[in-house]
Amino acid sequence: LKGGANHVYMSGPQPGGSDGTAGIFLLYEYPAGGTGATKYADGNHVVRAFPEGDFNVVQAAEIAEMQCPVRIEQYGLRDDSCGDGEYRGGCGMRRDVRILSDSASLSVLADHAVIPPFGVAGGYSGDANRFVVIRDGKTIQPSPVPGKVGDFALLKGDIVRMESSG
């Protein structure tokens, strides 16, 4: 029904404490995607599947910023990520997370990062999931395999951009 399973993990030393650290932080993000259109209506934007339980679509920025050394710089719909057709699919989301700790790591396990969710019944495919790091204004692919990232080293000031499929 939606763009695919997305699991994004950012972790590293939590600033504070007598030795400069107060343990380890872990920010688990699960950027939701849009649903496909039906024969009679547009799809829904940024939806979690019902069998996944009572999750928010994404964590509130205020909670993430209180618990982890990050700043949410952007959160909104990923414009035009939905599949076109007589009725359009729902849009995915875009979320930019700036790392405020001296170091951190990024891991991603996601589907539909190469082959986007396909359209059916005359509808067109939505955009594929995309996960990149922005460092000093340059976009970095954190892995040669899109959607599969293991322990990519993040630096203070890096922005992790998550763009879910429509």
Regions found by a protein language model. Give the residues of each.
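Glycine/proline-enriched, intrinsically flexible loops and inter-domain linkers
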Residues: 1-166
